[in-house]
Swiss-Prot record:
PTM note: The virion-associated Nef proteins are cleaved by the viral protease to release the soluble C-terminal core protein. Nef is probably cleaved concomitantly with viral structural proteins on maturation of virus particles. Myristoylated.
Membrane topology: Lipid-anchor
GO terms under cellular component: extracellular region; host cell Golgi membrane; host cell plasma membrane; membrane; virion component
Annotated site (Cleavage): 59-60
Protein family membership: Belongs to the lentivirus primate group Nef protein family.
InterPro entries assigned: HIV-1_Nef_anchor_sf, HIV-1_Nef_core_sf, HIV_Nef
Protein name stated in the entry: Protein Nef
Pfam families tied to this protein: F-protein
Induction: Expressed early in the viral replication cycle.
Region annotation (Acidic) ranges: 64-67
Region (SH3-binding): 71-80
Keyword Secreted annotated: yes
HAMAP family cross-referenced by the UniProt entry: NEF_HIV (MF_04078)
Length: 208
């Protein structure tokens, strides 16, 4: 028994050691999309998540054909966003500055999603938020940035004078938002410990 294998196959001790050391795949964070769930279960995107069946896959495929200032294809293996990764990314962006207090627009979110996808390999279906009006909480547990409406008087003040840019998100008067609210990214450390989105909208997490 096993004689033919022992004669023909080499390298088993090395493979056995790799198997012994292999760590289980990290669980995707609560709130990620269907494609990330696919990556969590199978380690790759399956036929159930293609450009024809998944809006995030279709969007990503379209971005790969455009010039966005940096290569879109990831430098590392594709994987789902995890709680720890979302938390680490939140701390990094808070420490480096630039996102906290920035006026939100879909284009800006796209740029951030593509940068994270390219440098870290996290599939861009993790940065989703609860619906408005009011504060929008992140669906992905561990992502510590929420979207907060800007007070109307601050919008008016920012738009005074002739120097304001009509294409700036502040001047768009919430055109990206169904509620027509101008939103700003705000860091909130409580989001690391309390999953507000799940408490407010448990229906989003039935398949998690």
């Amino acid at each position: 028994m096993g004689g033919k294998w022992s004669k023909r196959v080499t390298g088993w001790p090395t493979v056995r050691e790799r198997m012994r050391r292999a760590e289980p795949a990290e669980l995707a964070a609560d709130g990620v999309g269907a494609a990330s769930r696919d990556l969590e279960k199978h380690g790759a995107l399956t036929s159930s998540n293609t450009a024809a069946t998944n809006a995030d896959c279709a969007w990503l495929e379209a971005q790969e054909e455009e010039e966005v200032g940096f290569p879109v294809k990831p430098q590392v293996p594709l994987r789902p966003m995890t709680y720890k990764a979302a938390l680490d990314l939140s701390h990094f962006l808070k420490e480096k500055g630039g996102l906290d207090g920035l006026i939100y627009s879909q284009k800006r979110q796209d740029i951030l999603d593509l940068w994270v996808y390219h440098t870290q390999g996290y599939f861009p279906d993790w940065q989703n938020y609860t619906p408005g009006p009011g504060i929008r909480y992140p669906l992905t547990f561990g992502w510590c940035f929420k979207l907060v409406p800007v007070e109307p008087e601050k919008i008016e003040e920012a738009n005074k004078g002739e120097n304001n840019c009509l294409l700036h998100p502040m001047s768009q008067h919430g055109m990206d938002d169904p509620e027509r609210e101008v939103l700003v990214w705000k860091s909130d450390s409580h989001l690391a410990f309390q999953h507000y989105a799940r408490e407010l909208h448990p229906e989003y997490y039935k398949n998690c």
